[in-house]
């Protein structure tokens, strides 16, 4: 069995997502209630909050595809506050971001760590942002393997492949060399929002709305 992830313990409890505020809209046909995330989806805003897992990836991918079908020429905003998580789930989101026609703008609100940071950098260049006090962290994939020696060897090769693939993509997104990325992700590498701009993870720090 192989478990490959890019994650860190988060103060965010995804169970809290069950406590979602409702908003009421008035129209000529009366009142309509939305949960706040559905209402913001109408404004083409998607939230990636909490660990990146298969369930989260399916929701994000579905929302990206839906918004593309609604208007393929209008930007989508992806707000990220995540400690990271599954590499395969994160790559599903990444590939969909690159696949769809609309540009995807990313914004870090709080924490973008590990796979969360990878997805932050995956936004359209020139449209990757962070709030001033957010933190960004990059590191190499974490893996846990068990079983007989030959199985562990196979799993180790897969983790090394994923590390090389992630490093290559991050190098392209940041303008760094693969060697620099490999060195800088050898251990947890935390950055301030301003440092993330310098590194090439994001393009601008937003203190207020323009």
UniProtKB/Swiss-Prot annotation:
One of its GO terms (biological process) is protein quality control for misfolded or incompletely synthesized proteins. InterPro entries: ClpP, ClpP/crotonase-like_dom_sf, ClpP/TepA, ClpP_His_AS. It comes from the Bacteria. The active site is at 114 (nucleophile), 139. GO terms for cellular component: cytoplasm; endopeptidase Clp complex. Keywords: Cytoplasm, Hydrolase, Protease, Serine protease. Pfam families: CLP_protease. The keyword Hydrolase applies. Disulfide bonds: none annotated. Its EC number is 3.4.21.92. It is found in: Cytoplasm. It is an enzyme of class 3 (hydrolase). It catalyses: Hydrolysis of proteins to small peptides in the presence of ATP and magnesium. alpha-casein is the usual test substrate. In the absence of ATP, only oligopeptides shorter than five residues are hydrolyzed (such as succinyl-Leu-Tyr-|-NHMec, and Leu-Tyr-Leu-|-Tyr-Trp, in which cleavage of the -Tyr-|-Leu- and -Tyr-|-Trp bonds also occurs). Belongs to the peptidase S14 family. Cleaves peptides in various proteins in a process that requires ATP hydrolysis. Has a chymotrypsin-like activity. Plays a major role in the degradation of misfolded proteins. Fourteen ClpP subunits assemble into 2 heptameric rings which stack back to back to give a disk-like structure with a central cavity, resembling the structure of eukaryotic proteasomes. This is ATP-dependent Clp protease proteolytic subunit. The lineage of its organism: Bacteria, Pseudomonadati, Pseudomonadota, Betaproteobacteria, Burkholderiales. The gene is clpP.
């Amino acid at each position: 069995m192989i478990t490959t992830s890019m994650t860190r313990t988060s103060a965010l409890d995804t169970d809290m997502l069950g406590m979602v505020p409702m908003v009421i809209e008035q129209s000529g046909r009366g009142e309509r209630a939305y949960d706040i995330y559905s209402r913001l989806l109408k404004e083409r805003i998607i939230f990636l909050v909490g660990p990146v897992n298969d369930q989260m990836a399916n929701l994000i991918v579905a929302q990206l595809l839906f918004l593309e079908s609604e208007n393929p020429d209008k930007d989508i905003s992806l707000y990220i506050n995540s400690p990271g998580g599954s590499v395969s789930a994160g790559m599903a989101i990444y590939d969909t971001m690159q696949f769809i026609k609309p540009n995807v703008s990313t914004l870090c609100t709080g924490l973008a760590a590990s796979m969360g940071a990878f997805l932050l950098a995956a936004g359209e260049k020139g449209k990757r942002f962070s709030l001033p006090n957010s933190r960004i962290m990059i590191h190499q994939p974490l893996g846990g393997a068990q079983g007989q020696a030959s199985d562990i060897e196979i799993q180790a090769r897969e983790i090394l492949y994923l590390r090389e693939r992630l490093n290559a993509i991050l190098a392209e997104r940041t303008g760094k060399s693969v060697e620099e990325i490999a060195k800088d992700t050898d251990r947890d590498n935390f950055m301030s929002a301003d440092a993330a701009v310098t590194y090439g993870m994001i393009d601008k720090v937003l203190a207020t709305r323009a």
